[in-house]
Amino acid sequence: MIVNVIGAGLAGSEVAYNLGKRGIRVRLFEMRPKKMTEVHKTGYFAELVCSNSLKSEDITNAEGLLKAEMKLMGSITLEAAEKARVPSGKALAVDRNIFAKEVTEAIESLESVEVIREEVTEFDPEEGLWVVATGPATSDGLFSFLRNLLGDDFLFFFDAVSPIVTFESIDMEHAFWGDRFGKGKDYINCPLTDGEYEELWKALVEAEVIEMEDFDRKLLFERCQPIEEIARSGKDALRYGPLRPTGLVDPRTGKEPYAVVQLRREDKEGRFYSLVGFQTRLKWNEQKRVLRKIPCLRNAEIVRYGVMHRNVYINSPKLLDIFFRLKKQPNIFFAGQITGVEGYMESAASGIYVAYNVYRILKGLSPLKLPEETMMGALFSYIIEKVEGDLKPMYANFGLLPPLKTRVKDKFGKRKKLAERAIEAMRKFLEEYPW
């Protein structure tokens, strides 16, 4: 049987790669570059449209634990990320183009995967096995088809991305290199005095934004709040939030600045840097004006402006079973952010999980839940089985895991034990039920 995968984002790429490398025939549909979305820039698979950071690799961080589990199951996302890595302190950050190119080439090299560069606006639900992994920027044509198939069980939220500037346009006379608490020198830090901070805050509060249809502040995703919305919540909100100076010492003064705008490398050559936590929906001319309030960015060349977009996802607890299959048509799977998981790694992990169970089904075996002691198992169980009311997008966090049998007072020690238990549970599971 051929597995039809719609969408070559992180989740769809994991499905296609993990099945294709095991000899399963896959047809992977991707409409880009023939038809682009409002947030994508290339035709590569697994293009990262928000941040270039894949977050922590430390297992005492929920994102790090998730990666450790994904490595055990096998992940093209993490294989490509290693080849595209750029310096970013304790976080795993990548050169977007190298990363997406690595994923694309790995999938296109598989003989059992046929890549079809066409938009899918409909398909026969009765024919074959389908995996819908079109992400939050699902095209209007397919969205209409899915709405007819699923009913009105669609939800949405808004998120935004940050501007990117060229390194050569950053005035390093007004900036310094360093990570928090002296743990590296991978970030460019733009210190602000109290007067400069107030000027920036006022500019953000007063700036004009791009109006969006159906926009509702209650639907802003918490990890991608536009910086102007944070600014409007209070004068000090930014310097206790994305512009906090904690652990950053300006070598010119020997002190922590009043506030700091951090810049993170976007590419291996270090030509481009993004503003950390500076997601925005300001009009483009306003973004220019606001950035000029930051001393080291007074002459910055903006190569990508911040934008906001609406993300669509389905009401998974109502529509899907624990294996991410449609309850009423179990030959149709969903994977990625369209299911309500939030985050790059979470999306990729859901693709691995779907691929694992599709593989089992095609081999005549029953699909399996992952252990709830694992971050992957706990996240997917939450999305499908434990939500009360409408689903809100959920990302990996230690609060999803069942408690330890013995109490550990120290937060770090507790997370370490939870992580060790999760990794051991995943190892045992894969030993008993391998691909």
From Swiss-Prot:
Protein name: Methylenetetrahydrofolate--tRNA-(uracil-5-)-methyltransferase TrmFO
HAMAP family, per the entry: TrmFO (MF_01037)
Gene3D superfamilies in UniProt: FAD/NAD(P)-binding domain
Homology family: Belongs to the MnmG family. TrmFO subfamily.
GO cellular component: cytosol
EC number: 2.1.1.74
Cross-referenced Pfam families: GIDA
Catalytic reactions on record: uridine(54) in tRNA + (6R)-5,10-methylene-5,6,7,8-tetrahydrofolate + NADH + H(+) = 5-methyluridine(54) in tRNA + (6S)-5,6,7,8-tetrahydrofolate + NAD(+); uridine(54) in tRNA + (6R)-5,10-methylene-5,6,7,8-tetrahydrofolate + NADPH + H(+) = 5-methyluridine(54) in tRNA + (6S)-5,6,7,8-tetrahydrofolate + NADP(+)
